[in-house]
Amino acid sequence: MAALASAQPGDQFHWDGKTLTTLHGPQWRLLLVGAGDIARYIAPMAMALGFEVIVCDPREEYAASWNVPGTRLLTTMPDDTVTALAPDIRTAIIVLAHDPKLDDMALLEALPSQAFFVGALGSRRTNAQRRKRLLEHFGFTEALVARLRGPVGLPIGSRTPPEIAVSILAELTQERIRHTTQSSTHPLQECGLLADDLERGAVRVAD
């Protein structure tokens, strides 16, 4: 027997021994913290790649000038935004605000989350200082800080906002492909169904 129900952020494939829950619909989300020029170039390209794009910026001057069709603009604080978004394994978060307070607020919630990609704009020096803050002031572990991709973007020598956006999306796409490939086991395996469940006929799987 099959039934449809509304999914919630954070829902995943799940098997409880009797019922298999699968997800259908939009699978990839991108949260951009900071509504500046680079975000304006990232957003339309990310949507073309199949991402739902959410932009967060509590600064009035940036929020007021955001006009990229198809995106969702939030003016809540970054930490609250990430928490409400409930990032899952199909969520990417990139901080672009150029404001340590806003960027750090987002990272404090993003790094411990299930997001498959967490990136931060800035120079190597800026990101080194950011990692130091996370370790020394916020008590993050080395493993959590190692999840941060910063400077975000593949090293293609980008300088202008469009070039930086391309480099960021290239790294994001690369990681999504790698993530998808590594998760290419059958969804039943991802949600904890053991091999012997299949062997004894507990569930019939159609390829």
Located regions from the model:
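Short hydrophobic/aromatic-enriched beta-strand-loop microsegments
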Residues: 73, 114-121, 142-146
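Beta-loop-alpha module in the N-terminal Rossmann-like domain of NAD(P)-dependent dehydrogenases
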Residues: 100-104
